[in-house]
Amino acid sequence: METVRLNNGVEMPILGYGVYQVTPEECERCVLDAISVGYRSIDTAQAYYNEEGVGNAVRKCGVPREELFITTKVWISNGGYEKAKASIDESLRKLQSDYVDLLLIHQPFNDYYGTYRAMEEAYKAGKARAIGVSNFYPDRFIDLAEFCEIKPAVNQVETHVFNQQVKPQEIMKKYDTKVMSWGPFAEGRNNFFSNEVLKAIGEQYGKSVAQVALRFLIQRDIIVIPKSTRKERMIENFDVFDFTLSVKDMEEIAGLDKKESLFFSCLLYTSPSPRDIS
């Protein structure tokens, strides 16, 4: 498995398994399937309501905890120093672990400065190996990064072929912060899976549209966490390290970029419910 080195030296798999919209009832089975396929990075969140399923799978899978990379996120309602601090301990209890590998602020709302301070303390206490943010557009990201003690290791944002986050990624690089993609398949929107450019490129390599889309992001040094509840799709999504897109391929896919969200008209100023956003 290829990894990326975060700004504190921690190695993180560049490909992981996301459990957004995976029900609590099926989460344990899905994570066990993903680990059996070869995934070692699992992305969950307080707002997904399935941290316990992830924890059960990690306990039962037979893979040593230190070989797994677990990410969770502090939700808006747990924002602020005191609430965030308590919620981090609750997440660890549900995950049945003394630590998470990556701890993120889920949204730039509520008192996210206080939230981040609680996360910095968790990091120093060994409860998180790395910390970062999610859904922080450049202005909010810079505002936090300039005034925090520990620079965010990751910013998880909507990133796919139709919203490639090119300029935001350039800004993140200045802080040595990695971009992590949620929604790498755009949840099928904009006729993603029938896109002619992706199909034509995939035919050259004997790969699917999904595999081409993941490979494109990986070659841009973007962490990806595709989600599927079907094991055969987990296998397909995992099989992206035996080919390399050419410069021409990358340029053609770059031409698909619309530079706007397919999900929200203004993510910064609209606070969605936890069921509506990864």
PLM-predicted stretches and their roles:
Residues V22-E25, A45-G53, S77-E82, P108-Y113, ...:
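Acidic-and-aromatic substrate-binding clefts and catalytic sites of carbohydrate-active enzymes
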Residues A57-P64, L92-Q96, A145-C148, K173-K174:
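Acidic (Asp/Glu)-rich catalytic clusters
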Residues M1-L68, F185-A186, S271:
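N-terminal binding-site loop/beta-alpha segment at the start of enzyme catalytic domains
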Residues E66-N78, D101-P108, N135:
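A short, structured active-site edge motif that brings together acidic residues
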Residues A84-L104, E121-A125, T177:
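CE4/NodB-like, metal-dependent polysaccharide N-deacetylase domain
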Residues T23-D33, G80-K94:
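Short, acidic/polar
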Residues Q107-S265:
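Beta/alpha (TIM)-barrel catalytic core signal, keyed to glycine-rich beta->alpha loops juxtaposed to Asp/Glu
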Residues Y269-S278:
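Single conserved hydrophobic/aromatic residue that forms the stacking wall/gate
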